[in-house]
Amino acid sequence: MAHNTVADMSGFELGMPALVCRWRIYNRHLPLANRHLRALLARQVQGKPLTKELVAWAKQHIEWTLEQGAVEYPQGVLMLILDTEGRAAMTVGPFEPLEDTRLDYLIHRAEKAQVEAAQTHIAPETLWLARNDMLLWDQGDLCVPSGASSLVAQLAQTMGIRVQPYQGLLDGVATGALTYDEAFLVSDEFGIVPASDRRGSHGVRMAQGYQRLIERA
């Protein structure tokens, strides 16, 4: 059943944001567009699923928005904002890399994303760990993978790396109960970000493979 409606984009101001998606642009294109849209359809806002109408609107406006905004920011970030009334807007802004890539900060970002996922069913950023030639990540009970996470899972499969869901991963890292070799953040906005103080070969390989796929998309 449709719960959200798409308002005419002309002549209105957005109200209180209920959802903000930030998707990385590469060379004036949105390489993970289909993955982002599938994840968007799985999201909920204020306990209600988004409609196919809204996702169709987003798909159409991605092209229009990139034609205009990506001229100024060809390597920028496309932002989709949905307010509490179900009205949507889309814009493009500059991309600014993470200045702090220490593990503690990446954990902090993953924790914030987990709070968002409890409400929307999608975590835009997740922490991944490498242990004994296997990747661990916590998708959450009710959540489906974000666009970036779904690509990383597929990329790992093509590399012959096993991916294992691990519930309570962030708590295990925080308490020291979980042993691991390296860590990296997977983000719809920032891609794969290896922790500067827990960097390793798996994260580097994944980041390189991710970048190659983005460049070819």
Regions found by a protein language model. Give the residues of each.
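Conserved alpha/beta cores of soluble small-molecule-handling proteins
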Residues: M1-N132, G140, S150-A217
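Short, contiguous acidic and Ser/Thr-rich linear segments
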Residues: L136-S146
